[in-house]
Amino acid sequence: MGMYTELVMSTRVKEVPEVVGVLQYMAGNEPRPAELPDHPLFKTSRWEILFQCSSYYFVPRISVLFEHDDIGHYWVLISRADLKNYDSEIEKFIDWIRPYLEATNDDMIGYSRYEETREPTIYYGVP
C-alpha cells in the first residue's frame, strides 16, 4: 500500500504569470495552462492533484487558498494536503516553487510530515 506524507504551505508567491497560472490550476481556480514549465515536477503523474489529496491519517482535511494581495503585490499560498509521495512530488514541488517565493532562507514556507515520522521536514525560502 504505502504511507502518506502531509504537505502544509504558507507563503507569498511573486507575480510571475506562468507560475500563477499553474498554481491557480492546482488550487482548482482556473483551467490547466496550455504550456507547463520544464521541470521534473510536471513529469510526475500526480502533480495536478497535489493540493487536492487527503487521507484519514492526517487532520484536518485538504485546504487550499491562493489569492492575490493587492497591497503587497504578491500572491498568498496557504495549503494543506497529504498524498502517497511515490514520485517525490512534494520535494519536486518545493524545488520548483522556491525561486518564485517572496521568502529568504530565514523564512519558513511550509513543512512535510511522513505518516510514521514524529518530526516534520521544515522548508525555508531560497538564500
Which ranges hold each PLM region?
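Short, extreme N-terminal segment that most often corresponds to the first beta-strand
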Residues: 1-34
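Charged interaction segments
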Residues: 37-127
